[in-house]
């Protein structure tokens, strides 16, 4: 064994061994308990970042630990390979998205191997290959036949100059990112999947997910947004149709003083024919892209349509306004406004001088003060005719019942969730498998024409999708009749909604899934990824699983038993102000810093001499130039060091602060482990451990070893507090470093301890542990070694620590058997030099003994 720890030598050797032996390839084995450990698959952007490294290290630690427990562990990896960034990169680099993507996959695959992740590479998949997306296309056509897919017009961001649809992130300050033309809202036909048909099940089954974070479940509950309320119909004077609104607060209905409709509502459109101000307002709304998240904070604007609706219960006429806070795609595109008891309605009414009518008493029974804000709490009704004096629940029911009896109201359960629009007017995605015949009939692409293959050898102009620009691509025939293919492609969330299931049978050619393999491995035992995916990906992931279940492919209700959301990776961020006042962000690698005595940064500059402003720790990002390249760190310290730091620096679900001093600390620890094994093995062969012949000190050390095994097992397996597991191993290492190694049983005990330490560290730092296991002559490869088991007998405290005082002052601490008598304790204390010197030539007048804890000798 070489004396120095050289990770660059051992890591490549061990990785080659894993490749050649196909160590992590698995097949279904009914005789073994399975464990499916999955990290969210990466987008092949070109390089791994520290967020990836953290995510995949957590997964690998869990997978390796479960493998050592004797389970049949599946840990696959693949590539979420379609998406918009590839189109931009292709234009920039004068290539096509496919070669750019495949080059990135090859590069990042090497990076993953360099980090020593134990993946089953035989199951690797890339979602941009026809072998993958053909089954997604087939499944879509089956959903269409079941009535779960439909087409309707929907608003998109449209650049009139480029004549193309823009993704939300391509709209900068209301303008096209390429040509700066003002973006318009345009209605175009798009495909939808009926996720709303599963809304109740998606909501109710959250209660089955005991091992998902409550935050994620709450976000999904709110996103699905189930509410119970009443749908109310208003007659409108001089208008051919009625207006329908939905409210969850029918108890406030007597306080409704106006209605608001979306700018795109037919009533607003009709009113605009003779109202230039309203027409201009509608145009303004059409060209304003509003994300739902921004609705709460944006300025509320509106224009009176001139129409008057009739309140069904009071008979009063109330105005109908067009307002920018009502969206056509939500509900009916119309809302009732109760400004006395809804803050948004209150602000709008105050701005435009509309009537504010209170109908709910304050908590103390007085009339509410509405001079500053609305009263939004529930309470007892007044100013409400026959409903006066009713509390919230009674009023809800009484008003709902009356409206229903009059034929102008209906109790309804509503959902905030909208059907999933899966059409994208992009090129780099899976083609939607639908065709249109010459007579306008729309139908699924026949099975014998699947997959509809996306051409990869294309020229990108950065404006139009190549399959939209080439009229020949769309031409096909169905049953001998000319037809045109759909030129939209799938939302890339489609591919990432079922990849976890395809990993169970990536080579299967008879269908989307091999049910036997899928049902052996599924559900996923632990799924690891960022909380930013809580409502989009993780909802579609659950939805797709239920669709596949109802198609008879899987027999479980949910795709993953446990979800672990890892925290973000933070790093120091610095900038200097340029000549034009702009911020120039400087990488922390290039910052020369001064720190105070507590290690805090007080001053910083870069190599060019710029004084740097330190903004603290923030998420690693390109925008702040504070990302740390994992490859540089691996080349400097080794993969094991980077992995160990990642798992030790913070609990897995909390943010991790990147500190190179911490990386250096992890590296020093691994060097200490190496050194201890080197010194131990250099002394030659070891005798068998005789536990019955151990001294008290040896028993105490062995007790520490087995207590550490018990703690680390619990920390990794049950608690998933990996940082505390590592801390416990480090504490044990400190004790082992001080332990005597001269005697035969000292060395035998050290052998047992080091074999345990190396196995406990193996999930975290597999390369060094693989090597040290061989040096310690462990049986076989460590990859097939069992997890160490704590010896219950060894952990029993058969000795205890007694404090020895002379005249009340502590003079020594002695270890004695737990069943030692007072005489034996006194005898042992007298043998201690630190005690004996105070007893020399004096008389012991009194002895105070607290069994197992304290011996106080009073002398004089």
Curated annotation (Swiss-Prot):
InterPro entries linked to this entry: aa-tRNA-synth_I_CS, aa-tRNA-synth_Ia, Leu-tRNA-ligase, Leu_tRNA-synth_edit, M/V/L/I-tRNA-synth_anticd-bd, Methionyl/Leucyl_tRNA_Synth, Rossmann-like_a/b/a_fold, tRNAsynth_Ia_anticodon-bd
Main location: cytoplasm
Keyword Ligase attached: yes
Top-rank taxon, per record: Bacteria
GO cellular component: cytosol
One Gene Ontology biological process: leucyl-tRNA aminoacylation
Any Pfam family matching the protein: tRNA-synt_1
EC number: 6.1.1.4
NCBIfam families: leuS_bact
Name by which UniProt lists this protein: Leucine--tRNA ligase
Organism in which the protein naturally occurs: Escherichia coli O6:K15:H31 (strain 536 / UPEC)
Organismal lineage: Bacteria, Pseudomonadati, Pseudomonadota, Gammaproteobacteria, Enterobacterales
The encoding gene: leuS
